[in-house]
Structure formats: C-alpha cells, structure tokens
Design a protein with these regions (language model features):
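Helix-centered, glycine/charged polyanion-binding patches within enzymatic domains
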Residues: 48, 110-111, 116-187, 191
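Charge-patterned, long linear interaction tracts outside catalytic cores
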Residues: 187-189, 196-206
Length: 206
C-alpha cells in the first residue's frame, strides 16, 4: 500500500479506537467525478478515437441526465450513523458499481445497504453466510417484471436510510474541492480522492 493508503488506514484505526465507527451498517454508493483533461474525440471518417490526454479516464452515462461524463468514479462505503467513510476505491468512470462492491464491505458491520445496482443473488447469499443483513434494493427482472408490493416498500425504506450518502458526496464535491479530478492518470486520481476523504473524516471527527 502507498503512503496515502497507510494514512487512511491509520485514521480509520484511530476513529475506530475512539468509538466513532458504529458498525450499524455500511452504505455503499459511487459518484462520477469529471476530469479536467480534454475529452478524446472521434474522427469523422472511420470513427477512430483520437489519443486521450488522460488515457485512464473513461466515459460513462449520466444517471438521470442526458449526455455522458468523462473521468473517474469514487466508490465508497459509509458507516451508517457516524457518516464516516471507512472504505474507498477509485476507478475509471466506466467501471460498474457492483464490480468493486465487495471491497467496500468491512465484514463486521450489521447490515449492508445499497441501490439495486449492487444486488446479486451471490452477494445476497454471501452476506447472509457472514451474518450480515442484506439491505440491497431489488430490481425487476425477466422473471419478475413488476416488483411485489413488499419489495417496493423494502426499496423505499432502504432508499431513505441510504440518502445520507448523497450528502457525503455533496460535501466532498462542493466543500472539499472534489468536483473535478485535477491530475492525469488513475494513480493520481486515487491520491486526490483519498486526500479529500481523509480531510472529510478528520473534519467530521473534529
């Protein structure tokens, strides 16, 4: 692990020793952070992609918005109750949320909450096997195109509990200067995200 990873882990240890990490549950979510690098463009003939000024950044669709975003994605596990970020992973923006979900789970929390993008039957079984309550929102599928009323209610209840993560992202972007990735490359993007998360946790601890 690099220096910043060690610093984050040490801060996490001190927060835990101070009794500030409650372990009631982990709230998982991700946010796209645009890069300040110029977007690559496509040539008119042959649709060949021009060289990107940041080869590690990637495109992704904006949820609930038109168009696309170009940059990185910060995936976090937030301790319910304290609001402290105790797990963080940074990836290119096109990495699906569920890919890194298991890295955001501590293993000793009472429950794991997230939207339906994180739900898989395998993850549900794995959480149950570890004695962790699965509070992952459900989504319709080909076998069940319309969710049962109890699952719709379940989703609404989980959505209310995990709404605090949106406040976390708003604080990181608006108050902690994480609205844009200012450096080129995944390693430096990870460093910027980690620095902001460390500052966020220290501010909550103060």
């Amino acid at each position: 692990a690099g220096l910043l990873e060690k610093l984050f882990a040490e801060l996490d240890r001190q927060l835990d020793a101070a009794g500030l990490i409650l372990r009631q549950g982990s709230m998982l979510d991700a946010t796209v952070i645009a890069t300040g690098a110029a977007r690559p463009h496509f040539a008119e003939k042959g649709h060949e992609q021009a060289a990107a000024s940041d080869p590690d950044a990637a495109f992704t669709r904006r949820q609930g918005k038109s168009g696309s975003a170009y940059g990185y994605k910060a995936h976090v596990g937030v301790d319910e109750g304290s609001g402290l970020i105790w797990r963080v992973v940074t990836t290119p923006a096109n990495i699906n949320d569920t890919v890194v979900a298991d890295d955001l789970i501590s293993g000793d929390e009472r429950a794991v909450m997230a939207d339906s993008a994180y739900h898989t039957h395998a993850r549900q079984r794995a959480l149950k096997a570890r004695g962790i309550k699965c509070r992952l929102m459900r989504r319709p599928n080909k076998h069940q195109p319309d969710l049962a009323p109890r699952l719709k209610l379940f989703n609404r209840l989980i959505a209310r509990r995990r709404a605090a993560v949106e406040t976390t992202f708003a604080t990181l972007k608006r108050r902690m200067a994480l609205g844009t990735i200012r450096y080129r490359g995944l390693a430096k993007a990870r460093a910027q995200v980690l620095l902001n998360v460390i500052a966020f946790n220290m501010k909550r601890w103060a």
